[in-house]
From Swiss-Prot:
It is found in: Cytoplasm. Tetramer of two alpha and two beta subunits. Its EC number is 6.1.1.14. One of its GO terms (molecular function) is ATP binding. GO terms for biological process: arginyl-tRNA aminoacylation; glycyl-tRNA aminoacylation. The keyword Lyase does not apply. It comes from the Bacteria. HAMAP family: Gly_tRNA_synth_beta (MF_00255). This is Glycine--tRNA ligase beta subunit. Keywords: Aminoacyl-tRNA synthetase, ATP-binding, Cytoplasm, Ligase, Nucleotide-binding, Protein biosynthesis.
């Protein structure tokens, strides 16, 4: 079957830059979905997206649907004809439904059947509907109307190109009649651009100063920005989201180096970077030591004969923003950081839980408690907690919310606070996302954990639990943050005690009954998802969770040990044996003695197991106490042979009550040895 290339380009006013790439991907996905549903084969398809256009190119698209055969089954033969062989109403009705005479119906099978070959339709007639359906399904939160039209789209449409091979596909979509005339660059080539063929689309537009390929523009910008940064003896900060947004803002990217006065470098560089990236879409430059250079790169959408004018224009635009940051920084430094705490008495943390000032007091107390238990400095942790929210009341954070914590660090340093106290003011918000940086200091870790536990306890304490996708207080992220800090920083904290301490601090603001257990279950349940992401079987998690370790670090060490144990050849048999032992003990009506009476061990197999368990117990106990769980389970793996022999040769539930109880005691000792690490009966 013959095939042709197909191109559709919808021209619009400037599309939302943050959504441009996703709109292009969705446009392509919708068209591919429509082509597959129509049975139209093709070799490849790709999308193109620029500020004023969305396009899809389909290579080697079939010019027509394949013919298809439709089989319709009717009533069974015995219901289709009476005893005399005359057609019944059922047979006549089926023939009428098929639109044919009964003579054309197949009667060779158990049922009447009508087969019909339907000729495939030309692709050109199907393409407008496929394109329109894809456009209607684009993920656009709010569509708009324009002029006096009833059509709706994310932005007013301006033109429509639709070519199948060399021919225009005649149609009208979103108030635009299809043709082959596109538009060039708004300034360099404002006239119409004739698209000679789908395959020539990119080159035809390139000649009109438009790079329609999003990926090509993105790569060009990234490469040129890196080159310009190197020329300035620096490196550029290129967040992927910023690169995507800048790519979506320009059709003909021309990166240019600009500068600002060095005096602004006295302002925290994070504030300067924030305003230049977020407000101006500039790429900032760092020196070899990670310090901000007084230069930045802007990406113009025009190849100017006088680029210095564009440079000076951007320098003029950025100066007031940097001046504002400088002013806020100087104003805030005029008073001690702690003095900002008074303003927080009037800032509500949560209506039922009090003010941010009160939260800082709680964080201070809990941070000191935690620091004492993880080997930190309780006094510094308490001080950091008191100062932890002060910067929220500063001018700097009021203007640049992203500076919370960072501003606190700079103001604390300026005020002569201890280095770990200053760092903790920023580290309290760590980790800021999945896989993000963790606190570098014990003081920072203590404050970060305290802040998150305080939020968890408070919000749970007033019954505002996260539901489904709704988690307004980011409690899931807080729980994962606590776990990451304690596990990855190897901090051994009794979380049960810490949560209870947090509950006590709230007093009557929360419903304390059962609150600690609820919070702890929520936190430890987050570990399940963490381990699943790491490829750890849920049974491994459950085997440790059954013991309810109170320290996340201890929990993780047990999980890693069980994960290693599962790889041993003895693991499966011992897991099954432990499950059998668990069931036997659960069904026992006798009281299980605490110790094994060697004189009641009768059979050779139970004597061997008794000796093996006793020896293992003496070796495993110190290993478990030292939390060398991997070695403990490896030692217990040696019990497989005597355990297998015991169950093969010994009947547990004998008539002699004393012997039976003693065998229960032996099995309880066996199970207890494993329970020092995990309940491996759950691994089966």
């Amino acid at each position: 079957m013959s095939a042709k290339d197909f191109l559709v380009e919808l021209g619009t006013e400037e599309l939302p830059p943050k959504a441009l790439n996703s709109l292009g991907e969705a446009f392509l996905s919708g068209i591919e979905k429509g082509l597959k549903a129509a049975g139209l084969s093709y070799a490849a398809a790709r999308f193109y997206a620029a500020p004023r256009r969305l396009a899809v190119l389909v290579e080697q698209l079939a010019v027509q649907q394949p013919d298809r055969t439709v089989n319709l089954d009717g009533p069974p033969l015995q219901a289709a004809f009476d005893a005399s062989g005359n057609p019944t109403q059922a047979a006549l009705g089926f023939a009428k439904k098929c639109g044919v005479d009964l003579q054309q119906i197949d009667k060779s099978g158990p049922k009447l059947r009508f087969s019909q070959t339907i000729a495939g339709q030309p692709a050109a007639g199907l393409l407008p509907g496929i394109v329109e359906a894809s456009l209607n399904e684009l993920p656009i939160p709010k569509r708009m109307r324009w002029a006096a039209r009833r059509e709706e789209f994310v932005r007013p449409t301006q033109w429509l190109v639709m070519l199948f091979g060399d021919d225009v596909v005649e149609c009208e979509i979103l108030a635009q009649k299809a043709g082959r005339e596109s538009r060039g660059h708004r300034f360099h080539n404002p006239d119409n651009v004739r698209i000679s063929s789908p395959a020539a689309y990119l080159e035809d537009l390139r000649g009109a100063h438009v790079l329609a390929d999003f990926a090509e523009r993105r790569e060009l910008i990234a490469k040129r920005v890196a080159e310009l940064a190197a020329e300035q003896q620096g490196s550029a900060i290129v967040p992927p989201s910023l690169l995507d947004e800048v790519t979506a803002l320009v059709e003909w990217p021309v990166p240019l180096v600009c500068s600002f006065e060095e005096r602004f470098l006295e302002v925290p560089q994070e504030a300067l970077i924030t305003t230049m990236q977020d407000n101006q879409k500039y790429f900032c430059l760092l020196d070899a030591n990670g310090k901000l250079l007084p230069r930045f790169i802007t990406v113009a959408n025009v190849e100017s004969k006088a680029p210095e004018n564009i440079v000076s224009g951007n320098e003029k635009v950025v100066r007031p923003r940097l001046t504002d940051a400088e002013f806020f920084f100087k104003q805030d430094k005029k008073q001690p950081l702690e003095s900002f705490n008074e303003r927080l008495r009037n800032v509500v943390f949560q209506a039922q839980l009090g003010t941010v000032f009160e939260k800082a007091q709680r964080v201070s107390g809990l941070a000191a408690y935690i620091a004492e238990r993880i080997g930190g400095n309780a006094q510094n942790a308490s001080r950091a907690g008191i100062l932890s929210k002060c910067d929220l009341a500063t001018e700097m954070v009021g203007e640049f919310p992203e500076m919370q914590g960072i501003a606190g660090y700079y103001y604390a340093t300026h005020g002569g606070e201890a280095e770990d106290v200053a760092l903790a003011l920023n580290e309290q918000y760590m980790p800021r996302g999945a896989g993000a940086e963790l606190p570098s200091t014990l003081t920072g870790a203590a404050v970060a954990v305290a802040d998150k536990l305080d939020t968890l306890v408070g919000i749970f304490g007033i019954g505002m639990l996260p539901t489904g996708s709704k988690d307004p207080y980011a409690l899931r992220r807080a729980a994962l943050g606590v776990l990451r800090i304690l596990i990855e920083k190897q901090l051994d904290l009794d979380l049960v005690a810490a949560v209870n301490a947090a509950v006590e601090q709230y007093g009557d603001k929360v419903k304390a009954a059962g609150l600690a257990e609820q919070v702890l279950d929520f936190v430890f349940d987050r570990l399940r998802a963490r381990y699943e992401d790491e490829g750890v079987d849920v049974a491994v998690y459950q085997s440790v969770r059954a013991l309810k370790p109170s320290s996340p670090l201890d929990f993780d060490q047990r999980v890693q040990a069980v994960q290693a144990f599962r790889q041993l050849p003895e693991a499966e048999a011992l897991a099954a044996a432990n499950k059998r032992v668990s069931n036997i003990l659960a069904k026992s009506e006798d009281e299980v003695p605490p110790n094994v009476d060697a004189s009641l061990l009768v059979e050779a197999a139970e004597k061997a197991l008794g000796s093996a368990v006793a020896n293992a117990e003496s070796e495993v106990a110190p290993l478990a106490a030292a939390r060398d769980y991997r070695a403990a389970l490896a030692r217990l793996a040696a019990l497989r042979e005597p355990v297998d022999t015991f169950f093969a040769d010994v009947m547990v539930n004998v008539d002699d009550a004393a012997v039976r109880a003693n065998r229960y005691a032996l099995l309880a000792k066996l199970r207890g040895s494993f329970l020092g690490v995990a309940d491996i009966s759950l691994l089966g």
